[in-house]
Amino acid sequence: GVWLAVLAFALLPVLGVGQYTIQWPGTWCFISTGPGGNGTNSRQNWGNVFFASDFAILGLSALVVTFACNLATIKALVSRCRAKATASQ
């Protein structure tokens, strides 16, 4: 399930939705966030915006899930420490 979704997202540029562009100094690439170069049509620009937006939403979602899991862990550890402290008294 998750692996198929990740594969589908990674293949979007191959299918023509969004694109990667080479970044300076030419040793790495990243998603294109703006209109392309010569002759880029509005469909390609829409694809770039869609892919960049999805990329950002997935990244922010991962950040929120990580933060929520960390908060749950902190809450569990604090309650466990408090329970041990009251049990030892």
Curated annotation (Swiss-Prot):
Which InterPro entries does the record associate with it?
A: Prostanoid_rcpt (IPR008365)
Subcellular localization(s) per the UniProt record: Cell membrane
Q: Give residue ranges on the Cytoplasmic side.
A: 75-89
**Coarse class of the protein's main subcellular location:** membrane
| Glycosylation sites noted in the Swiss-Prot or TrEMBL record | 38
Membrane topology per record: Multi-pass membrane protein
Instruction: List residues traversing the bilayer.
Output: 1-18, 49-74
Q: Name one GO cellular component term.
A: plasma membrane
Keywords from the named record:
Cell membrane, G-protein coupled receptor, Glycoprotein, Membrane, Receptor, Transducer, Transmembrane, Transmembrane helix
- Tell me which stretches of the chain form a coiled coil: none
Extracellular topology ranges: 19-48
What does the subunit section of this Swiss-Prot or TrEMBL entry state?
Interacts (via C-terminus) with MKLN1.
What the protein does comes down to: Receptor for prostaglandin E2 (PGE2). Required for normal development of fever in response to pyrinogens, including IL1B, prostaglandin E2 and bacterial lipopolysaccharide (LPS). Required for normal potentiation of platelet aggregation by prostaglandin E2, and thus plays a role in the regulation of blood coagulation. Required for increased HCO3(-) secretion in the duodenum in response to mucosal acidification, and thereby contributes to the protection of the mucosa against acid-induced ulceration. Not required for normal kidney function, normal urine volume and osmolality.
* Matching PANTHER family: G-PROTEIN COUPLED RECEPTOR FAMILY 1 MEMBER (PTHR11866), PROSTAGLANDIN E2 RECEPTOR EP3 SUBTYPE (PTHR11866:SF10)
Q: Which family does it belong to?
A: Belongs to the G-protein coupled receptor 1 family.
**Name of the protein in its database record:** Prostaglandin E2 receptor EP3 subtype
- Organism of derivation: Ovis aries (Sheep)
Q: What gene is this protein a product of?
A: PTGER3
